[in-house]
From Swiss-Prot:
Name recorded for this polypeptide: Alpha-1-antiproteinase
Subcellular location: Secreted
Modification sites for Phosphoserine: S33, S378
Pfam family, one: Serpin
Native source species: Mus saxicola
Site residues, Reactive bond: M377, S378
SMART domains: SERPIN
Keywords, alphabetical: Glycoprotein, Phosphoprotein, Protease inhibitor, Secreted, Serine protease inhibitor, Signal
Domain comment as written in the entry: The reactive center loop (RCL) extends out from the body of the protein and directs binding to the target protease. The protease cleaves the serpin at the reactive site within the RCL, establishing a covalent linkage between the serpin reactive site and the active site of the protease. The resulting inactive serpin-protease complex is highly stable.
Cross-referenced InterPro entries: Serpin_CS (IPR023795), Serpin_dom (IPR023796), Serpin_fam (IPR000215), Serpin_sf (IPR036186), Serpin_sf_1 (IPR042178), Serpin_sf_2 (IPR042185)
Length: 413
């Protein structure tokens, strides 16, 4: 008989931030030509790419008039870690919802590729600050399954903290301090409140700080119009740059594509749709196209006008993950018996994701030939990012999508 007591688990999936960084005058570029070509890394990048754009389209479906910003790799890491302690249909839903084909990839291999990915992302880089972290907050009288703890530490580099959830304010502060420290103070007060029967919390964060290889000159930034929609226009600081840049027009997406590298191993891909083509861009964009853009680069003289911006995203993942098939972990049928040795069932009561982004002149702070067409003109192309656009930030060694976003209104944080 199922016990009448039900304990709750809080998942803080992907608390992430991107923040701008001042340019270092004496920084030398790192050789990023040696991409991580291992099959595991390629599979992970493909799965995360599919997951990223599935999640993006669901966010657009929920609201196509708001800024969007999230970290697919951070959300996926949190749920993959949770799957370590799940069983049966609960585990299957999580892993298939993350776009893994369980007939081709074993559970053990999935956790190994996450381990490899996290080791790659946390690799020291003097030019690019990129770090991730996982924290397990366990009620001090709750006994966890030793195998779950060992694998969480081994595969996901998790830290474990003993917490008295009966003192909810102290527990909330401990979780918030962990996130605030991991994001270097950019995300504070991540947890607003805790359910009274919470006994376990999992927090994942990602922090990214990058400097543009080709920075904007602040002296060239001017006030300009940004057209939110046909009836709304806002004034924004518009950064201006004319250089040799990776710019081309993609007829498949009816969009201009701008790729801007960071010092280190990351690239931002900005997609500016033609008038009236945003919906077409969002329905057509996929991981394969992003990969082709990164492999078929076309540097040419171009002039760009790009808004200085600071946006954020905060999401209830329970509603967001349901269309991807991840539902059982949130209800009373959840099987998370691989986490705790206690008899009372555990279920995920709340899963939240928060991300913040700043792009300015210095950089970002928080994160087939027939398809890609290069347009050659006698005059350099001029790109005005003065209406809604889509972007992704990719770790170039693995082509992992770190962040995905949409700017509808740069003035709305």
């Amino acid at each position: 008989m199922t016990p009448s007591i039900s304990w709750r688990l809080l998942l803080l999936a992907g608390l992430c931030c991107l923040v701008p960084s001042y340019l270092a005058e004496d920084v030398q570029e790192t050789d990023t030509s040696q991409k991580d070509q291992s099959p595991a890394s390629h599979e992970m990048a493909t799965n995360l790419g599919d997951f990223a754009f599935s999640l993006y389209r669901e966010l657009v479906h929920q609201s196509n008039t708001s800024n969007i910003f999230f970290s697919p790799v951070s959300i996926a890491t949190a749920f993959a870690l949770l799957s370590l302690g799940s069983k049966g249909d609960t585990q299957t839903q999580i892993l298939e919802g993350l776009q893994f084909n369980l007939t081709q990839t074993s559970e053990a291999d999935i956790h190994k590729v996450f381990q490899h990915l996290l080791q790659t992302l946390n690799r020291p880089d003097s030019e690019l600050q990129l770090s991730t972290g996982n924290g397990l907050f366990v009620n001090n009288d709750l006994k966890l399954v030793e195998k779950f703890l060992e694998e969480a530490k081994n595969h996901y580099q998790s830290e474990v903290f003993s917490v008295n959830f009966a003192k909810s304010e102290e527990a909330r502060k401990m979780i918030n301090d962990f996130v605030e420290k991991g994001t270097q103070g950019k995300i504070v007060d991540a947890v607003k409140d805790l359910d009274e029967d919470t006994v376990f919390a999992l927090a994942n964060y990602i922090f990214f700080q990058g400097k543009w290889k080709t920075p904007f000159d602040p002296e060239h930034t001017t006030e300009a119009d940004f057209h939110v929609n046909e009836s709304t226009t806002v004034r924004v600081p518009m950064m201006n740059l004319m250089r040799m840049l990776d710019v081309h027009y993609c007829s498949t997406l009816s969009s201009w594509v701008l790729m801007m590298d960071y010092l280190g191993n990351a690239t931002a891909v900005f997609l500016l749709p033609d008038d009236g083509k945003m919906q077409h861009l969002e329905q057509t964009l996929n991981k394969e196209l992003i990969s082709k853009f990164l492999l078929n680069r076309h540097r040419s003289l171009a002039e760009i006008h790009f808004p200085r911006l600071s946006i954020s995203g905060s999401y209830n993942l329970k509603a967001l993950m349901a269309p991807l098939g991840i539902t059982r972990v949130f209800n009373n049928g959840a099987d998370l018996s691989g986490i705790t040795e206690e008899n009372a069932p555990l279920r995920l009561s709340k899963a939240v994701h928060k991300a913040v982004l700043t792009i300015d002149e210095r950089g970002t702070e928080a994160a087939a030939t027939t398809i890609v067409e290069a347009v050659f003109m006698s005059l350099p192309p001029i790109l005005h990012f003065n209406h809604p656009f889509v972007f992704t930030i990719v770790e170039t060694h693995t082509q992992t999508p770190l962040f995905v976003g949409k700017v509808v209104d740069p003035t709305r944080k």
